[in-house]
């Protein structure tokens, strides 16, 4: 079941245009035509009406769009008319709050309840309304009582339970639960939500044992009997669409990824104890901190053909939001950097529009604040050393983009359920 809707909304927008993903196949050496519409030819020297340097790839003609950091995809009609998908949120941290904020601008999803044992309704309203990174909430929010918020005229119930099994999701009307506490990240732990009547749980973090999905890459492998799923990490959501396009067109033999990642809540404001990661205990605003990440290896879980071919690391830097992936890879097929750019641009305008972006502008990190796409390829930041070895650079709003994908995955799951 294809994903019917991908939200493209900025932090200041009240509109929610949507796009549709088209089917795409796995990389296959014997393919004549790839999932992106490229046909391999020994004689053609045209790409979408424009010459490319090697003359090896011929793409279907597409209508070009302006390649900017915040280009919005076109709106399409929803394919489901069974009402809004009812969602509950467990954990009102960065992702929980942004998932709720974005959901209020969507016409396909309604958040009906939020659980957080450490935040009461008044403080919840304050944290939701004011955001140092994404700005003040543009809608209305009121506290009705200790257990009820009113957001844009609609009520959201507030619960304060430490044990997920005690949250009465069914009574609250929530069928899908976003597990964004950062605590219950395994199937066994997240399954506690099912005891309260939730039908499905979406973990907003990597999971050791839950099926992992990246919208635009492998969400079509989701099955209705999967009750607990993971939306992977923000970095995997950035890297996987990029790797998918490059691997399907040219083949990736091996690659090393570095993410230059904005500060997150797990870091220290000043030097402090961090027994598992000594460097991670150093002051976040004072240092560039090398760190480990499983994001690159996780790509092998959503793209099995890349399993064991990618690994990587992170540098935590003193910026509040927006991160960037640097993928240095060796290709199986000879291709110039211009060829790779052309393939990514084509995908960004068609099969992966709204997920993968493309820009040739001289952008910096703040230009992607509030960008809902998972990955925006920076054509002028990368470089090729040879026809099989190159560095690719792609930006992502690690908060806003990721939170959009959480909701997109939920809606895809709801569409699959509705089609049965």
Swiss-Prot record:
- Main subcellular localisation: plastid
Residues at which D-glyceraldehyde 3-phosphate binds: 233-235, 264, 293-294, 316
Expression tissues = Expressed in shoot and root vasculature, leaf veins and vascular tissue of flowers and siliques.
Task: Quote the Gene3D superfamilies the UniProt record gives.
Answer: Dihydrodipicolinate Reductase, domain 2 (3.30.360.10), NAD(P)-binding Rossmann-like Domain (3.40.50.720)
GO BP annotations, alphabetical order: carbohydrate metabolic process; glucose metabolic process; glycolytic process; intracellular amino acid homeostasis; primary root development
| Active site per the UniProt annotation | 234
Keyword set includes Chloroplast:
yes
Q: What is its EC number?
A: 1.2.1.12
* Location in or out of the cell: Plastid, Chloroplast stroma
Q: List, alphabetically, the GO terms of the cellular component aspect.
A: chloroplast stroma; plastid
Knockout or disruption consequences: No visible phenotype under normal growth conditions. Gapcp1 and gapcp2 double mutants have severe dwarf phenotypes with arrested root development and male sterility. Pollen grains show shrunken and collapsed forms and cannot germinate.
Which SMART domains does its entry note? Gp_dh_N
Transit peptide segment: 1-66
Task: Give a yes or no for keyword Cell inner membrane in this entry.
Answer: no
User: Which parts of the sequence bind NAD(+)?
Assistant: 94-95, 116, 162, 398
Q: Which cysteines are joined by disulfide bonds?
A: none
Listed A to Z, the keywords are:
Chloroplast, Glycolysis, NAD, Oxidoreductase, Plastid, Transit peptide
Stored InterPro entries? GlycerAld/Erythrose_P_DH, GlycerAld_3-P_DH_AS, GlycerAld_3-P_DH_cat, GlycerAld_3-P_DH_NAD(P)-bd, Glyceraldehyde-3-P_DH_1, NAD(P)-bd_dom_sf
Which chemical reaction does it catalyze?
D-glyceraldehyde 3-phosphate + phosphate + NAD(+) = (2R)-3-phospho-glyceroyl phosphate + NADH + H(+)
SUBUNIT field: Homotetramer.
Role of this protein = Involved in plastidial glycolytic pathway and plays a specific role in glycolytic energy production in non-green plastids and chloroplasts. Essential for breakdown of starch to form sucrose for export to non-photosynthetic tissues, and to generate primary metabolites for anabolic pathways such as fatty acid and amino acid synthesis. Plays an important role in plant development by providing substrates for the phosphorylated pathway of serine biosynthesis in roots. Plays a crucial role in pollen development. Functionally redundant with GAPCP1.
Name under which the protein is recorded: Glyceraldehyde-3-phosphate dehydrogenase GAPCP2, chloroplastic
The species this protein belongs to is Arabidopsis thaliana
Query: What is the name of the gene encoding this protein?
Result: GAPCP2
């Amino acid at each position: 079941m294809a994903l019917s809707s991908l939200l493209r909304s900025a932090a200041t927008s009240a509109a929610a245009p949507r796009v549709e993903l088209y089917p795409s196949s796995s990389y296959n050496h014997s393919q004549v035509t790839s999932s992106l519409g490229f046909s391999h030819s020994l004689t053609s020297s045209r790409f979408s009406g424009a010459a490319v340097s090697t003359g090896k790839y011929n793409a279907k003609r597409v209508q070009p769009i302006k390649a900017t950091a915040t280009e919005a995809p076109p709106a399409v009609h929803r394919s489901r008319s069974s009402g809004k998908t009812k969602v509950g949120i467990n954990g009102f941290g960065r992702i929980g709050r942004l998932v709720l904020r974005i959901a209020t601008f969507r016409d396909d999803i309604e958040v009906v309840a939020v659980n957080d044992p450490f935040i009461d309704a008044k403080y919840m309203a304050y944290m939701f309304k004011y955001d140092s990174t994404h700005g003040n909430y543009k809608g209305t929010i009121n506290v009705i009582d200790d257990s009820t918020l009113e957001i844009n005229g609609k009520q959201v119930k507030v619960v304060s339970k430490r044990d997920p099994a005690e949250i009465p999701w069914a009574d609250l009307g929530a069928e899908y639960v976003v597990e964004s506490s950062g605590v219950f990240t395994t199937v066994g732990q997240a399954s506690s939500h099912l005891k309260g009547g939730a039908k499905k749980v979406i973990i907003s973090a990597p999971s050791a044992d839950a099926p992992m999905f990246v919208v635009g890459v492998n969400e079509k492998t989701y099955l209705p009997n999967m009750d607990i799923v993971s939306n992977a990490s923000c970095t995997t959501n950035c890297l996987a669409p990029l790797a998918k396009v490059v691997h399907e067109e040219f083949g990736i033999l091996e690659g090393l990824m570095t993410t230059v990642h904005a500060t997150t809540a797990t870091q220290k404001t000043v030097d402090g104890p961090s027994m598992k990661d000594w460097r991670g205990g150093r002051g976040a605003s004072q240092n560039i901190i090398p760190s480990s990440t499983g994001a690159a290896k996780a790509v092998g879980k959503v793209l099995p053909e890349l399993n064991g071919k990618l690994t990587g690391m992170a540098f935590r830097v003193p910026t509040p939001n927006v991160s960037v992936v640097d993928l240095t890879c060796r290709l199986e097929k000879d291709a110039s950097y211009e060829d790779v750019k052309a393939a990514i641009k084509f995908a960004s305008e068609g099969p992966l529009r709204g997920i993968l972006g493309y820009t040739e502008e001289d952008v910096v990190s703040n230009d992607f604040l509030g960008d809902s796409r998972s990955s925006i390829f920076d054509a002028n930041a990368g470089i090729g050393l040879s026809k099989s070895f190159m560095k690719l650079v792609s930006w992502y709003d690690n908060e806003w983009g990721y939170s959009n994908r959480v909701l997109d995955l939920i809606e895809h799951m709801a569409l699959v359920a509705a089609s049965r």
